[in-house]
């Protein structure tokens, strides 16, 4: 099998529309270029990070807008409680996203490693398995959620009577398009690893722009409120999915989704799921923690505190998405060079990406600490107690921001080099091992010393950030030390 050749930047934007070009023109352009993936093992790391990460960052920022635009419109034009209604069902959607990450990132990491090893015979098999799994797993999740909708909302998530109408309306419609919500981002990873990060970015932009355009139309013009926000979201997800499929159906890439490769093989499926387990468990843990956290908030406060926390997570999404973009951009670089045993390039890639993430987080820290009111006002025009609580929530929860780059990049690093156990441990450290005990213990401690118990929920964030970043640093140091020992033995 031969792979997609490298294109000039201008041509990359035409990839999704290749089917409308004359065949002779397509063949001419293909013949003018060289193998796109070759440069991952030879070009300067800094240039590769820019080429791969910048489009991913833009795409993830657009994706952040994708995720929060509903809340902006609902908070400003419908009801602040509508934000809480959307926010409280996010753990369910995070499970769908976790499934997408389990398959998409796991398959893409294996895909990149196999490219570095020049094992081209396995590449399309990996893609075919990813497609089948991204359809199967979300379908199971949707079926379970539809059957047990009310018990999930009432008994597990403890949704109040005031929030229930918003939560039920939004979740029921969102589930209709959950398969596309999983498949579109899950398959987009392959476009990036095929050597076309800008095309991958374009797919995300198309979906986000569609959502931004449709949201006010469905919410206000059609007067559908929360239901309108949900319909706009699933339509935009479907359009993104169509664009992904159109790329892999064109002559601009030799990669194809073939039915024969969608017949699941236990061994290959196991490899995909093992590598993708770290990001999956992190996202799944976030979902479970979200349910627990909402229950604790409702226990010690009420719907207003839940709304404030949802606004904080919306702000968090905007700041964290660039880090996820950097992680996505570094993944094929680290995976390819690790497969090619170019460990020096892997270490340099990690160093540069870590410094970039620290810079982003430091900027986010400055904004959230010195302008929390601005962050809050994006989602609500409230000037009373909700605003004060929202500003306090944002300040405390982001107080350890500059140090969490090590934890986030550490999990991405071990996942990219095909070491899922270490990646899973680091992912669990922040979301479960350190956060849950803090979430349960600190409110009690704050109550004992005479402070509002809800403050304990907020301080659980920076404490778990600090502890997990420390653990990640230890893991990374040990891994790099092992590489030095291997290199020393090889010289002997």
At which residue positions do the language-model features occur?
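Short alpha-helical transmembrane segments in multi-pass integral membrane proteins
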Residues: 3, 12-53, 111-177, 221-276, ...
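Residue-level signal for short hydrophobic patches within transmembrane helices
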Residues: 42, 46-65, 69, 92-99, ...
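Transmembrane helical elements of multi-pass membrane transporters/channels
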Residues: 51-70, 173, 184, 207, ...
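Helix-terminus/linker motif at the lipid-water interface of multi-pass membrane proteins
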Residues: 61, 65-83, 153-161, 217-224, ...
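Helix-loop interface residues and adjacent transmembrane-helix termini in multi-pass membrane transporters
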Residues: 68, 77-80, 114-117, 193-194, ...
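Interfacial/gating helices of multi-pass transporter permease domains
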Residues: 74-94, 161-166, 226-229, 268-275, ...
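Small-residue-rich hydrophobic transmembrane alpha-helices
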Residues: 83-143, 181-200, 308-366, 370-372, ...
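Short runs within selected transmembrane alpha-helices of multi-pass transporters and secretion channels
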Residues: 104, 174-192, 200-208, 229-242, ...
């Amino acid at each position: 099998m031969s792979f997609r050749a490298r294109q000039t930047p201008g041509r990359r934007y035409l990839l999704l529309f290749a089917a409308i070009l004359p065949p002779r023109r397509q063949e001419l352009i293909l013949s003018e270029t060289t193998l796109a993936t070759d440069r991952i093992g030879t070009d300067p790391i800094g240039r590769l990070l820019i080429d791969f990460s910048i489009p991913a960052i833009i795409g993830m920022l657009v994706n952040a807008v994708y995720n929060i635009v509903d809340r902006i419109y609902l908070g400003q034009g419908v009801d602040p409680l509508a934000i809480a209604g959307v926010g409280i069902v996010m753990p369910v959607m995070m499970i769908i996203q976790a499934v997408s990450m389990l398959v998409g990132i796991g398959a893409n990491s294996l895909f990149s490693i196999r490219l570095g090893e020049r094992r081209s015979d396995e590449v399309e098999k990996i893609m075919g398995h990813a497609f089948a799994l991204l359809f199967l797993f979300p379908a199971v999740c949707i079926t379970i959620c539809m059957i047990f909708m009310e018990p999930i909302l009432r008994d597990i998530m403890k949704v109040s009577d005031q929030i229930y109408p918003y939560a039920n309306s939004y979740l029921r419609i969102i589930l209709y398009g959950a398969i596309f919500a999983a498949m579109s981002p899950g398959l987009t990873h392959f476009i990036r690893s095929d050597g076309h990060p800008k095309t991958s970015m374009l797919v995300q932009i198309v979906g986000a722009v569609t959502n931004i355009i449709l949201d006010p139309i469905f919410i206000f013009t059609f007067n559908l409120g929360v239901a309108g926000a949900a319909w706009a979201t699933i339509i935009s997800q479907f359009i993104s999915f169509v664009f992904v499929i159109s790329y892999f159906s064109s002559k601009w890439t030799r990669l194809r989704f073939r039915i024969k490769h969608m017949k699941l093989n236990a061994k290959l499926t196991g490899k995909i799921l093992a590598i993708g387990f770290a990001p999956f468990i992190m996202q799944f843990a976030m979902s479970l923690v979200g349910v627990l956290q909402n229950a604790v908030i409702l226990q010690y406060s009420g719907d207003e505190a839940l709304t404030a926390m949802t606004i904080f997570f919306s702000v968090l999404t905007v700041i964290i998405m660039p880090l996820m973009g950097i992680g996505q951009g570094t993944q094929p670089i680290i995976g390819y060079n690790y497969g090619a045993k170019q460990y020096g390039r892997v270490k340099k890639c990690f160093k540069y990406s870590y410094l970039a993430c620290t810079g982003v987080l430091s900027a986010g820290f400055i904004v959230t600490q010195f302008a929390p009111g601005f962050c809050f006002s994006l989602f609500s025009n409230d000037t009373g107690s909700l605003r004060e609580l929202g500003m306090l929530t944002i300040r405390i929860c982001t107080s350890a921001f500059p140090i969490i780059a090590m934890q986030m990049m550490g999990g991405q690093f071990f996942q990219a080099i095909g070491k899922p156990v270490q990646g899973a441990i680091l992912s669990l450290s922040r979301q479960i091992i350190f956060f849950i005990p803090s979430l349960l213990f600190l409110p009690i401690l704050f109550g004992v010393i005479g402070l509002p118990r809800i403050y304990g929920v907020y301080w659980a964030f920076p404490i778990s950030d600090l502890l997990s970043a420390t653990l990640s640093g230890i893991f990374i140091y040990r891994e790099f030390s092992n590489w030095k020992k291997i290199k020393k033995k090889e010289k002997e």
